[in-house]
C-alpha cells in the first residue's frame, strides 16, 4: 500500500464548482477511499506552464502530510498560482469558493453532416470570500483546502424527512 498519493500536477486550477468535475480531485478521492493520504495539486495556468514552483509546493505539502497525517476521509486540494514575479505570497488554508461555470451549447455539424452539440461557456467568478480558494490564488497564495468525502447536507435532512414521498 502506498504511503501517499499525489494526483496532478493538473494544468488549470481546481477551485469552486470545478471540484465536482475534476479528474485530479477524483483520483485523490479514490486514494482517500482506500485509506491512503492523498493530495490533489493543480497549477493555475493553461498556457506557458512552468511547474517549478508547483514541484516545490508538492514536495513541501507531501512532507507535511506524511509527518502529520490527515483525518479519515479527508484529502487536500492544493492550487498553485501561476508564476508571478517575486514568487508566491505564501500558503493559505482556504475553503471551496463560489466560482462556477455558465454553460452554453452550440449546435454544430460534423464533416459528414451529422449534428452535434459543443459545450462551451465561461467562468463566472462571484467570489469575494477572502478565505476562498479562488481568491487566494488570485492574490498569489498557494491555496490548501481540506476536502471531505462526506457530502450529505445534514442541515436539510430533518426538513426532507417531512416531505410526502
Language-model regions, residue ranges each:
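Hydrophobic/aromatic ligand-binding patch that stacks against planar heteroaromatic rings
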Residues: 27-32
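Short, glycine-/small-residue-rich phosphate/pyrophosphate-handling segment
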Residues: 39-68
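C-terminal accessory domains and tails appended to enzymatic cores
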Residues: 67, 71, 81-165
Amino acid at each position: 500500500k502506498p504511503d501517499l498519493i499525489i494526483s496532478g500536477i493538473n494544468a488549470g486550477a481546481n477551485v469552486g464548482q470545478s471540484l465536482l468535475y475534476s479528474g485530479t480531485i477524483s483520483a485523490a478521492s479514490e486514494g482517500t477511499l482506500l485509506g491512503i493520504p492523498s493530495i490533489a495539486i493543480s497549477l493555475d495556468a493553461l498556457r506557458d506552464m512552468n511547474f517549478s514552483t508547483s514541484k516545490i509546493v508538492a514536495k513541501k505539502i507531501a512532507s507535511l502530510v506524511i509527518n502529520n497525517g490527515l483525518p479519515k476521509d479527508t484529502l487536500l486540494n492544493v492550487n498553485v498560482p501561476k508564476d508571478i514575479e517575486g514568487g508566491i505570497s505564501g500558503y493559505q488554508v482556504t475553503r471551496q469558493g463560489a466560482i462556477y461555470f455558465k454553460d452554453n451549447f452550440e449546435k454544430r455539424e460534423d464533416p459528414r453532416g451529422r449534428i452535434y452539440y459543443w459545450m462551451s461557456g465561461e467562468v463566472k467568478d462571484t467570489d469575494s470570500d477572502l478565505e476562498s480558494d479562488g481568491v487566494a490564488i488570485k492574490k498569489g497564495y498557494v491555496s490548501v483546502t481540506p476536502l471531505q468525502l462526506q457530502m450529505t447536507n445534514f442541515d436539510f435532512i430533518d426538513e426532507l424527512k417531512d416531505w410526502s414521498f
